[in-house]
């Protein structure tokens, strides 16, 4: 009798995706982050669902309802901080996952990569709207500043902003719709992640060498299920340490002050995972230019397959490209630091230099380095 997992319509899909999936034998721990992102998404959906049971999306009671969750609901503090810090873990895994894709040339699977870029945008939108919900000072002013950026769009900008706000300022209507979108988007993300996997399994996984590995495949289970379990345990350990020992480490103290439209915080800044993009936005003195640079800082990822000039797929055997890649990583860390600093000398000029270097590295220097490496191989 044939095994049920190979015949049952639903079990067959699970089997072909997680059990009998032919996987390259040499993929490293950098390939763990896909499954870790799946775990993060599940954690976020479950904790978010329980938070939604006690939260009220109303300007008068939103802040109080979050306080009530932390003080009065059984383990409410745990659920709330798991959700808040779970978002940080989500973005850490996302950035490492994207970095892995850039380093090993995984972007050559164009469909998978483009769905991934859309997933990144969707996750960023979800996180932004989630940050508005507690209705603290940074929630309110963050929402005001970021939505206001759309007013830079010529002709329709102002109408668009007022349409998103549902009025003439960030108010009850804005909070209600942000809650609705924040609730529905993770399920859309889950569906998109399914499509992401579907496209990936059409081609099979890439591997560190960037070479075709069809001749050397092993089943996903038990080899990579056990490896992913180790990664999952590491993720849960770090998340637990964060939640139980320093839950406010990555948050902003201003968000413990209820939203007040009459009092602007001294430094308006988003959560740490948006600081690099925020620094790029602020480094351009023109509003529309800043918005375009902000969008392009992420959208430039979609250009990666077209900017690939090397004869080799992976950077494993390309030392010059490796140097530029790690320079890009360092540049992003500098941008993240600058995004959290006030707009004054010397931070302004550092931010501008780092922003120029970011686009220069991706659009010019890395493709040129690849051409140079191609020529070096002709000896």
Swiss-Prot record:
Binding sites annotated in the UniProt record for heme b b566: 97, 196
Stated name of the protein: Cytochrome b
UniProt organism field: Desmana moschata
Chief site of localization: mitochondrion
Subunit structure: The cytochrome bc1 complex contains 11 subunits: 3 respiratory subunits (MT-CYB, CYC1 and UQCRFS1), 2 core proteins (UQCRC1 and UQCRC2) and 6 low-molecular weight proteins (UQCRH/QCR6, UQCRB/QCR7, UQCRQ/QCR8, UQCR10/QCR9, UQCR11/QCR10 and a cleavage product of UQCRFS1). This cytochrome bc1 complex then forms a dimer.
Transmembrane segment boundaries: 33-53, 77-98, 113-133, 178-198, 226-246, 288-308, 320-340, 347-367
GO molecular function, one term: metal ion binding
Binding of a ubiquinone, residues: 201
Required cofactor names: heme b
Family membership noted in the UniProt record: Belongs to the cytochrome b family.
The keyword Electron transport belongs to this UniProt entry's keyword annotation: yes
Domain of life: Eukaryota
GO annotation, cellular component aspect: mitochondrial inner membrane; respiratory chain complex III
InterPro entries: Cyt_b/b6_C, Cyt_b/b6_C_sf, Cyt_b/b6_N, Cytb/b6-like_sf, Cytochrome_b, Cytochrome_b_C_euk/bac, Cytochrome_b_N_euk/bac, Di-haem_cyt_TM
Compartment annotation: Mitochondrion inner membrane
Cofactor note: Binds 2 heme b groups non-covalently.
Membrane topology: Multi-pass membrane protein
Gene3D superfamilies: Cytochrome Bc1 Complex, Chain C
Positions contributing to heme b b562 binding: 83, 182
């Amino acid at each position: 009798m044939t095994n049920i997992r190979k015949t049952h319509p639903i079990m067959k899909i699970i089997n072909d995706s997680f059990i009998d999936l032919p996987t390259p034998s040499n993929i490293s721990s950098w390939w763990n982050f896909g499954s870790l992102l799946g775990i993060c998404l599940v954690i976020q959906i479950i904790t978010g669902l329980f938070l939604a049971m006690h939260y009220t999306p109303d300007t008068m009671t939103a802040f109080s309802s979050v306080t009530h969750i932390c003080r009065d609901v059984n383990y409410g503090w745990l659920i709330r901080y798991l959700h808040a810090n779970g978002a940080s873990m989500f973005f850490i895994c996302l950035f490492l996952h994207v970095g892995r894709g850039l380093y090993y040339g995984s972007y050559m699977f164009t469909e998978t990569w483009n769905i991934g870029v859309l997933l990144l945008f969707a996750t960023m939108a979800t996180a932004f709207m989630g940050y508005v919900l507690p209705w603290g000072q940074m929630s309110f002013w963050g929402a005001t500043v970021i939505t206001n950026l759309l007013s830079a769009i010529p002709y329709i900008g102002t109408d668009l902003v007022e349409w998103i706000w549902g009025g003439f300022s960030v108010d009850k209507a804005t909070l209600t719709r942000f809650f609705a979108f924040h609730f529905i988007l993770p399920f859309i993300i889950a569906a998109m992640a399914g499509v992401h996997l579907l496209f990936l399994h059409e081609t099979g996984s890439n591997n560190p060498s960037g070479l075709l590995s069809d001749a050397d495949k092993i089943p996903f289970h038990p080899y990579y299920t056990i490896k992913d379990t180790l990664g999952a345990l590491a993720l849960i350990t770090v998340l637990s340490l964060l939640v139980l020992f320093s839950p406010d480490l990555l948050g902003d103290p201003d968000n413990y002050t209820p939203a007040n439209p009459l009092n602007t915080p001294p430094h308006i800044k988003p959560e740490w995972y948006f600081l690099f993009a925020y620094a790029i936005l602020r480094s351009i003195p023109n509003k529309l230019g800043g918005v375009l640079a902000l969008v392009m800082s992420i959208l430039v990822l979609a250009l990666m397959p077209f900017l690939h000039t090397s004869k080799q797929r992976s950077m494993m055997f390309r030392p010059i490209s490796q140097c530029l890649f790690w320079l890009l990583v360092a540049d992003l860390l500098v941008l993240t630091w600058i995004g959290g600093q006030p707009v004054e000398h010397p931070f302004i000029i550092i931010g501008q230099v780092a922003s120029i270097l970011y686009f220069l590295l991706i659009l010019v220097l890395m493709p040129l380095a690849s051409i140079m490496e191609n020529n070096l191989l002709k000896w």
